[in-house]
């Protein structure tokens, strides 16, 4: 799973017919402390996430299994909205 923050939306007037009712969001991976890291990615929203929210994203075949997207051309799907992240660092 990828921890990420929603930073934008994607509008596609023409797309695969199986994605017509799907919302596409731009996400930026973050570390457990919320610091941005890695490249942006586009993911199908299955949980009605909003701008600025921290989310959980699955990719690959797991993304296609999320919320009935099995036969869709999807590589990343948002499957959870994160309320909090707690990290216990060694030595603290």
Locate each region found by the language model.
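Short alpha-helix capping/helix-loop boundary micro-motifs
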Residues: 39-43
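C-terminal structural segments of small proteins and small subunits
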Residues: 56-92
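A generic local secondary-structure boundary/capping motif
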Residues: 14-17, 44-46, 66-69
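Residue-level recognition of beta-strand microenvironments
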Residues: 9, 13, 46, 81-84
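A structural micro-motif recognizing beta-strand termini
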Residues: 30, 44-46, 60
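N-terminal first-folded block
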Residues: 1-37
